[in-house]
Regions:
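N-terminal hydrophobic/helix-forming segments and targeting peptides
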Residues: 1-281
Length: 281
């Protein structure tokens, strides 16, 4: 369970999730393929390919006698992203001339009220220039804490009768006061260890800083952020690694696990994209 909690804590965004899955696969002896480079596959080997840094597909080719198909298939799929707030391109705005807030939009099927009155932070991916090349890097501004606040009960006496939140006007994360607030890109650059003017773009999300924990009198319950859908990503990874065993039950079976972005989406990393469409087993 400790490893699972660590995985959740280390994966505030889909980019971090794929990065951590990739590390685990490489440690297990898997080889990374590039979609743009022709490759040759060998039986008995394990491979994986990533797309956009947010989706990953891994597969194992069993050793079979020539002319024979695998005796079975182990196939699993999950999505690497979680419902959250995505920061818009013009991501910083001021309210009443003093409060610095994030300009965000809904991402995924969110339960809006669960984001109120709890410590939040920002993470994602940046693109920057290095020696004339475009480089991507994941970032986690975990030292920054922001918050989406409820109004005081005095200001809305009907609060406990049910409130419909407008995510565009009622749920902008507050990150500081204008007189004390450094530029967001400077915070990103300092965290990434690069020059601020080398950053060309960022893809950032708001995430909950709360940690996973066991609950209940016998610790039989589990709670934490991003369980949708990182619990399935972790389960799929562990199942895939277990399927690479050397026993008789595993040696002639193919295995495949898929971590995609925007489940059901038709974008280049979604469930209905060409990466999945052209995967045959």
């Amino acid at each position: 369970m400790k490893d699972f909690f660590t995985f959740i804590d280390n994966c505030p965004t889909c980019f971090h999730a794929v990065e951590n899955v990739k590390v685990a696969l490489l440690a297990a002896g898997a080889m990374e393929l590039q979609e743009t480079i022709p490759f040759h596959l060998e039986s008995g080997k394990t491979y994986f390919v990533t797309r956009n840094g947010s989706s990953l597909l891994a597969f194992h080719l069993p050793k079979c006698e020539q002319g024979k198909r695998p005796s079975g298939y182990r196939i699993y799929a999950a999505h690497s992203d979680s419902p959250c707030f995505k920061i818009k391109p013009c991501g910083v705005m001021k309210a009443e001339g003093e409060y610095v807030m994030l300009n965000t939009e809904k991402y995924g099927g969110m339960i809006l009220s669960t984001w109120l009155d709890r410590p939040l932070s920002l993470a994602g991916r940046i693109v920057y220039e290095k020696e004339g090349m475009l480089v991507t890097k994941t970032v986690n501004l975990d030292e920054l804490t922001c918050i989406i606040t409820n109004v005081a009960i005095h200001m809305n006496r009907d609060m406990n009768k049910g409130v419909e939140y407008n995510p565009q006007t009622d749920m902008r994360p507050l990150i500081g006061l204008s007189k004390d607030m450094p530029e967001l890109r400077k915070l990103i650059a300092d965290k990434a260890g690069i020059q601020q003017d080398s950053i060309l773009g960022e893809d950032l999300y708001v995430y909950s800083k709360e940690k996973c924990c066991l609950m209940g009198t016998s610790e039989e319950l589990l709670g934490g952020p991003r369980l949708d859908d990182l619990e399935c990503v972790y389960a799929g990874l562990q199942g895939f690694l277990s399927a690479l065993g050397t026993g008789d039950n595993a040696k002639d079976k193919a295995a495949l696990t898929d971590c995609i972005t925007t489940e059901g989406g038709y974008n280049t990393e979604g469930e209905n994209d060409s990466e999945d469409e052209h995967t045959t087993v």
